[in-house]
Amino acid sequence: MMKIGIDIDGVLTDVEQWQLDYGSKYYYEKYGMKIKNYKGYEASEIFDVDKKLDDEFWNEYFREYSINVETRKFANEVIDKLKEENEIYIITARGSFLSHSTGVMSIEENKTIVLNWLEKNQIHYDNIIFSPEDKLDICKQNKINLMIEDKPENINTISKEIPVICYHANYNEQCNGKNIYRCYSWYDIYRKIKEM
């Protein structure tokens, strides 16, 4: 039995495509701007905007994203299969002061929306950790054996200690090395975990 940590944005959701879709609409309609760096991790990098314009975008769309973003195909199905033999930990910065939500909703409302979204999308788990802390510390404290992550900084840091499944995105293409296993779909993740 393993303890498997799973991130939300970029792993359970396709935040990369969502930011490209909604960001290009918002910045084009409002400012006539276009995508500057499709490999950016944050919307601010994708559209090369300052914090003020980035906050403006998220203030407009964060609630919509949080409540209605779709899960990646087969995420709930594969997580249920993994849960049969493992403990599932959802580990997210959402519901913390690091989240884009700070100008839109309270931390507690954000946590409630996350919990409702997980339930609505039938994502079953054993524990959820809302934390702005370094995810490596969270993994160590909770004895996580494997992390499924998309953020380059987290992938590179966590993989120094435990295996990380890198959910492929344009912004994390440069992540590779010992303990990093690139996957492209939830059933690809399932296959990789079964082989470990």
Language model features by range: what are they?
Residues 1-53:
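Active-site neighborhood of HAD-like aspartate-dependent phosphohydrolases
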Residues 66, 75-111, 131:
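Substrate-recognition element of Asp-dependent hydrolases with the DxDx(T/V) motif
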Residues 1-3, 84, 191-196:
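Short, Lys/Arg-enriched, disordered terminal segments
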Residues 21, 97, 173:
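Flexible, glycine-rich phosphate/dinucleotide-binding loops
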Residues 16-18, 94-95, 170:
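Short, flexible active-site-adjacent loop segments at beta-strand->alpha-helix junctions, enriched
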Residues 103-146, 151-196:
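C-terminal cap/substrate-recognition subdomain and adjoining C-terminal extension
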Residues 46-62, 95:
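Short, basic/glycine-rich phosphate-binding loops at helix/coil junctions
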Residues 7, 91-93, 148, 167:
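Short hydrophobic segments within beta-strands
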